[in-house]
């Protein structure tokens, strides 16, 4: 039985990991497409219009792959978690249905109009079509994260005598504190991925001395949006999410921070390897008191460690949760450093000559995908109840 449960989890983890490669690009890319089209309306410079159409074609391919990989994921709710689907379908079925009804049709309809309907629509309606694709993309994220937020922090429901969960407060479901903070964090993370992809394509064009005009446009746009998103994904949205994890899932919070013992003046671990046998961190590098400060804005406050919780309430794989969180934070720090340096050179008007930095930006794009996936691993590996 335990083996079958593990296999079900591994199968679902593989399916949803592969699926999320695609939405994390489309959600952020839709905003950049709207920006390019808006810039064209303001300046009438044709390169912005062509950039918008070019990236919408990339969006369409990723959107299609997202749909194809998302269908088996929904099937696996029934095949792998049949009892969960039976009992909670009255709630999660509604949010998933709204995602399909509102978001999917909004995106799929206006993608075609944007790619092929420029001459028919005129530029203002063409911009509106792009904006509606963006709206559908972000609404899709909202409904999916609403589903996940209910699983993280169940609200707005009652349990019937037959054990079924039914929704009794629609607005409470969509004002779930977990939903609001997770959505903002997720969208900034998606914008990081799309910004690095756009910037990396621009860097590649410049390095190859091909389509230099568009290479400079893509690189400049990716750097500006990437720096903005890289900062916001850590503060305030990442800070908000960590505090919500502490409030709602304190055992998972202790595990991801590598805090084995309850402490006043709790330290923030930078590096270290969890030793589950000894219940400690090996080769630890930490900042004293800083975890208490980030959590409560006071250095001497108490943070519960894993020793404060029964073993059955702890995440099943503490090292994986710990490493996922710390690698994600480490990559986020690298993103800020690289984008800040690139923005500095952009301000100095010599970014396009920095070949070493262009190589770094180009090669970092896959790591933006990895950081996004690790963020979801952190959310799901420690999820309660």
Show the residue positions of the predicted features:
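Polytopic transmembrane helical bundles with strong interfacial aromatic enrichment
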Residues: 1-385
């Amino acid at each position: 039985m335990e083996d079958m449960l593990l296999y079900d989890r591994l199968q679902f983890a593989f399916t949803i990991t592969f699926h999320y490669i695609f939405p994390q690009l489309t959600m952020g890319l839709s905003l950049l497409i709207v920006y390019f089209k808006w810039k064209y309306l303001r300046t009438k410079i044709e390169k912005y219009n062509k950039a918008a159409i070019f990236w919408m074609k990339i969006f369409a391919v990723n959107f299609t792959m997202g749909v194809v990989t998302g269908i088996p994921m929904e099937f696996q709710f029934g095949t792998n978690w049949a009892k969960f689907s039976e009992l909670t379908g009255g709630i999660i079925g509604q949010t998933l249905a709204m995602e399909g009804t509102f978001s999917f049709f909004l995106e799929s309809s206006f993608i075609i109009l944007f790619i092929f309907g420029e001459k028919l629509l005129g530029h203002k309606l063409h911009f509106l079509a792009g904006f509606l694709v963006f709206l559908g993309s972000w609404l899709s994220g909202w409904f999916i994260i609403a589903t996940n937020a209910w699983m993280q922090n169940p609200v707005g429901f009652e349990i019937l005598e037959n054990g079924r969960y039914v929704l009794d407060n629609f607005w409470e479901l969509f004002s779930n504190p977990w939903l609001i903070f997770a959505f903002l964090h997720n969208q900034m993370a998606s914008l990081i991925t799309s910004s690095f992809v756009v910037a990396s394509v621009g860097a590649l064009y410049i390095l190859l001395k091909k389509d230099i005009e568009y290479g400079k446009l893509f690189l400049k746009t990716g750097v500006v949006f990437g720096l903005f998103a890289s900062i916001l994904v850590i503060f305030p949205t990442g800070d908000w999410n960590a505090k919500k994890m502490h409030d709602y899932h304190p055992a998972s919070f202790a595990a991801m921070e590598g805090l084995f013992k309850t402490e006043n003046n709790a330290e923030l671990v930078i590096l270290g390897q969890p030793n589950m046998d000894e219940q400690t961190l090996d080769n630890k590098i930490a900042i004293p008191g800083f975890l208490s400060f980030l959590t409560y804005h006071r250095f001497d406050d108490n943070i519960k460690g894993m020793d404060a919780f029964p073993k059955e309430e702890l995440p099943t794989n503490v090292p994986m949760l710990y490493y996922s969180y710390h690698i994600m934070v480490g990559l986020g720090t690298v993103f800020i450093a690289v984008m800040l340096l690139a923005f500095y050179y952009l301000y100095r008007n010599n970014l396009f000559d920095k070949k070493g930095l262009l190589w770094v930006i180009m090669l970092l794009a896959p790591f933006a995908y990895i950081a996004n996936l690790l963020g979801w691993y952190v959310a799901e590996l420690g999820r309660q109840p």
